[in-house]
Swiss-Prot record:
This is rRNA 2'-O-methyltransferase fibrillarin. Keywords: Isopeptide bond, Methylation, Methyltransferase, Nucleus, Ribonucleoprotein, Ribosome biogenesis, RNA-binding, rRNA processing, S-adenosyl-L-methionine, Transferase, Ubl conjugation. Residues 281-313 are annotated as: Helical. S-adenosyl-L-methionine-dependent methyltransferase that has the ability to methylate both RNAs and proteins. Involved in pre-rRNA processing by catalyzing the site-specific 2'-hydroxyl methylation of ribose moieties in pre-ribosomal RNA. Site specificity is provided by a guide RNA that base pairs with the substrate. Methylation occurs at a characteristic distance from the sequence involved in base pairing with the guide RNA. Involved in the biogenesis of the 18S rRNA. Coiled coil: none annotated. The modification Omega-N-methylarginine is found at R8, R12, R16, R22, R34, R40, R52, R58, R66, R70, R73, R81. InterPro entries: Fibrillarin, Fibrillarin_CS, SAM-dependent_MTases_sf. Methylated by HMT1, forming asymmetric dimethylarginines (DMA) within a domain referred to as an RGG box, made up of repeated Gly-Gly dipeptides interspersed with Arg and aromatic residues. Component of box C/D small nucleolar ribonucleoprotein (snoRNP) particles that contain SNU13, NOP1, SIK1/NOP56 and NOP58, plus a guide RNA. Interacts with snoRNA U3. Interacts with MPP10, NOP58, SIK1 and SOF1. Component of the ribosomal small subunit (SSU) processome composed of at least 40 protein subunits and snoRNA U3.
Amino acid sequence: MSFRPGSRGGSRGGSRGGFGGRGGSRGGARGGSRGGFGGRGGSRGGARGGSRGGFGGRGGSRGGARGGSRGGRGGAAGGARGGAKVVIEPHRHAGVYIARGKEDLLVTKNMAPGESVYGEKRISVEEPSKEDGVPPTKVEYRVWNPFRSKLAAGIMGGLDELFIAPGKKVLYLGAASGTSVSHVSDVVGPEGVVYAVEFSHRPGRELISMAKKRPNIIPIIEDARHPQKYRMLIGMVDCVFADVAQPDQARIIALNSHMFLKDQGGVVISIKANCIDSTVDAETVFAREVQKLREERIKPLEQLTLEPYERDHCIVVGRYMRSGLKK
């Protein structure tokens, strides 16, 4: 990376020269040395990069490591908590909310207040009580990032029917470490249940530790291809959500639906085209998968690509017709 002491030295040196007394003097020589925030962030990025890069080899390493990492940390905490007044509005899907503030965010009511599952932002809002003389209660919401969750991406894209609502029983196939599962747990609430099936043991361990704090999640570390292995743990469910990314995912979903899903129950499937067939275009893959679902008595209701959030992904929502599809 080319470094021009003049450019950085002048700008940072001049700006921060007033306090600390180092900016002006060392500006030209060390590249705006102790600028940044708190006297370190910018410093070692520009400073040592230019002056000490030649001998000792410290320039590049410290520039990338300290300058970059500390900059990122500032961004993470910002957003809704930055002193802005946040108003929570209910989304048209029950159990999902929108936080209106500096930016509009998709949020769910935290089932385990004070606990963050994957480092997501939390927003505390005072809700006035319905009785006179009772102080307002604090309610915590968790930001649901559509870039981290296919289900959130589908909701942002405008899914009409979700089948996941307060009090519902949901079978979640391909739960991984529980990023989306935790939000589904928030949506169904204490009256609902999420049966989270994951085959890999490493994410499975994280899923189990998360489920310890959320009594409505039942983690099942088992292969979703063999639903008979966990049939004694699950009753009939209202909805099957699948994010398994396997070539035979239509068959996996069908097996679980036939065994656990109520008649007229909902099926929500995230399809990743590359995982099923990377030799044809995504639209062809989606069409083939929808046809396979029809053959398994799942009536497709809508299909939605997750374009701004995920590439070559789509969500298909269907209804399970136990008696068969009418021709």
